[in-house]
Amino acid sequence: MATSTTRPPTGEERDQRPLDIQAMRAGAHRLLAEDPKPSVEELGTVALRLREHIVLAVPEVEEMAGRLPHDDTRRACARACIGEARMRMRLKPGATPAARIARAQRLARSVNALCDHYENLDGS
């Protein structure tokens, strides 16, 4: 059986492909807006996409925050956001449609917050 030699992208490789903040925010907005929510059938796909956005954004924000001084407020806020996003990634889907929507909305809020930190730290 072959073993995988896949490795996470280096910082330089990630810099070559910046996050698509606009697409990430659009996906989050779909669950946070007053518009009709996705159907129960679509919700799993939407939640999976939000989780993928978080997986991509966390290392980027973590790296940018890590460049700041240890006592910088922006660093502390970004690290708290990362911790919250990781915690939300561990949440299990609920048994009811309302619980599944609530979980997906929490993921969407984390995506938005990570996008905010990505944009704010990029100008550092």
What do these predicted ranges mean?
Residues 1-5, 121-124:
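Short intrinsically disordered terminal tails
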Residues 2-46:
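Short terminal alpha-helical segments
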Residues 24-27, 53, 57, 81, ...:
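Amphipathic, well-ordered alpha-helical segments in soluble domains
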Residues 33-37, 63-70, 87, 91-95:
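General structural signal for alpha-helix termini and helix-helix connectors
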Residues 40-59:
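Short, well-structured hydrophobic secondary-structure segments
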Residues 44-48, 72-79, 98-105:
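Short, charged, amphipathic alpha-helical segments
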Residues 56-76:
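Short, solvent-exposed, charged loop/turn and helix-capping segments
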Residues 80-124:
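Amphipathic alpha-helical binding modules
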